[in-house]
Amino acid sequence: MGSASRASLDSARRVLAELGGVDLSTAGQLLGAGRAIGGSTHLLSALADTGIAPEVKHSIVDRVFGATVQEPALRVLRAVVDGRWSSHDELLAGIEELGIRAVAISAPEGTPVESELFTFGRAVSTDDGLELAFGDKLGDPEAKSTLVHRLLDGRASEQTVVIVEQLVQQPRGRRIGELVRHAATLVADQAGLTIATVSVASPLSPEQSERLAQALSRRYSRRIELNQVVDRDLVGGLRVQIGDDVIDGSVATRINDLRLQFA
């Protein structure tokens, strides 16, 4: 995201924070408004046009969404259109991020939204049929939404369902795995956490997980949430990825390094 878009997003995030608590209905309305804006080239162009005065854009937002969107979501949308966005896609990305953060805020304490997203993403990535169904660019968004409900209703929180519905209905050219990982990162960040994806040959015990999380928290000066991926090809040891940082202590990598040394 460009610097202008990042500054605009930061400003809109402050407005979201000033709302205090938001409910899931408000968060869903914000995401729905983003989909509506993305589905109308004329509306998107008008709201992203830096030559149109903010008060005129406010009027457009109120006229289009005033009857269906509650005031808290309207306040966030007005803050979005007040900003300068580097591209139309980044404006839509900004609304989506704000909506996902609003969903995270709406979750009751202890709701495992981030881990549910991680589990869903892993399930899709290991099922070619699901990946194809969600990744089909010509697929009906409503059919994808129906599939989300069939897979997640009764198995995941309402918050997770709302987020995944958003991702499959407005992918904007992104793959489902990328979408879910990014959403999980936003949910964790909203809770003050950083995600560490830990690949291991066999599952860590609760005690090992706790020690690793504490060690990583000290290293990064931030609370760390572990997501485990079992990969038998690692043979032993583990590989940790936090953002762009990779700590690779797997036996497979050490063996490969030795092979290269003796090649």
Curated annotation (Swiss-Prot):
Any one GO cellular component localisation term in the record: proton-transporting ATP synthase complex
Assigned protein family: Belongs to the ATPase delta chain family.
The keyword Repeat appears for this protein: no
KW Aminoacyl-tRNA synthetase (keyword) present: no
GO MF assignments: proton-transporting ATP synthase activity, rotational mechanism
InterPro entries linked to this entry: ATPase_OSCP/d_CS, ATPase_OSCP/dsu
HAMAP family in the record: ATP_synth_delta_bact (MF_01416)
Self-association and partners: F-type ATPases have 2 components, F(1) - the catalytic core - and F(0) - the membrane proton channel. F(1) has five subunits: alpha(3), beta(3), gamma(1), delta(1), epsilon(1). F(0) has three main subunits: a(1), b(2) and c(10-14). The alpha and beta chains form an alternating ring which encloses part of the gamma chain. F(1) is attached to F(0) by a central stalk formed by the gamma and epsilon chains, while a peripheral stalk is formed by the delta and b chains.
Function: F(1)F(0) ATP synthase produces ATP from ADP in the presence of a proton or sodium gradient. F-type ATPases consist of two structural domains, F(1) containing the extramembraneous catalytic core and F(0) containing the membrane proton channel, linked together by a central stalk and a peripheral stalk. During catalysis, ATP synthesis in the catalytic domain of F(1) is coupled via a rotary mechanism of the central stalk subunits to proton translocation. This protein is part of the stalk that links CF(0) to CF(1). It either transmits conformational changes from CF(0) to CF(1) or is implicated in proton conduction.
Gene: atpH
Ranges in coiled-coil conformation: none
Keyword field: ATP synthesis, Cell membrane, CF(1), Hydrogen ion transport, Ion transport, Membrane, Transport
Subcellular location: Cell membrane
Membrane-crossing segments per the record: none
UniProt cross-references to PROSITE patterns, sorted A to Z: ATPASE_DELTA (PS00389)
Topology with respect to the bilayer: Peripheral membrane protein
Name under which the protein is recorded: ATP synthase subunit delta
